[in-house]
Amino acid sequence: MNQRKSELIPSFSRPPSRVLIRKVARYEEDLLAIIHESLTEFRLQMKDKTVLLKPNLVGLDPLGVMNTHPAVIGATRESFLKMGAARVLIGDGPAMDRDTEAILESVRLREFTGKLGRDFCDLNIDDVERVELKTRASRLKELFLPKTVLGADFFVSMPKLKTHHWAGVTLAMKNLFGIVPGSCYGWPKNVLHWAGIGNSILDINAAARPDFVIVDGILGMEGNGPIQGTAKAAGVLLFGDDMVAADATACRVMGLRPEKIDYLAKAGTMLGHLEAGKIQQLGEPVAAVRTEFGVVKEFQHLRV
């Protein structure tokens, strides 16, 4: 079984990260072909691996604005299976609506994935293991994390492209709040809020680093996100092999400056690449897809 470790890697010692942007106007497009072609660009070796997809499933969302769209999740799962993965799990631990089954029905996930059975894991109630934190960015000294996350061979963060009224943005890194079980940390993951949102984001991502990122930006959310914002069509899917680089690029797509987001700036020194010059840009250039996202007044300083 793979066991994820908390790791800090100085920025200067890492090779350039890769981020790929695809224009995708509607969820009705051939997402399987688009996603499979995009994943192939990264030459991922998936044979016989157990993959965990971690979408952003926040709450009841029949309009598809709040959560990662099920069409993206389903096509991604099928693509990894085509690439030779032995098993592709889907898991999340929603923070707001505690009825995970009701959320799955609301977003119509099984219409795009078929019956999942044990291939879906409610991370709020999964068995946990203790992970000692090396970062100690927050007040926490340790985290109790789901065994499903720690045991995955390949872990994919699949956020929605959204602003956040407390964190500025919620993307691949903030999405990992959903792996921290509510059974241990309360709802809506209150212990993490008390420990400091930004610093908790750093600790979680160091303890359970995603191997890959796929951002659903076909339809995002601006303003008072992550729940009460307004739908914003950005028309993109974003892929990356570094969660910091992916989040930084997603911010630039949104017309926001990632270096002004405190936790992202810190992450750029120890977890991944923040600077555009250290990110190999594939597919569409940021300038071709930039869509200005509105933010709450506390984060107006993020705007380019």
Protein language model features and the residues they cover:
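N-terminal and secondary-structure boundary signal
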Residues: M1-V304
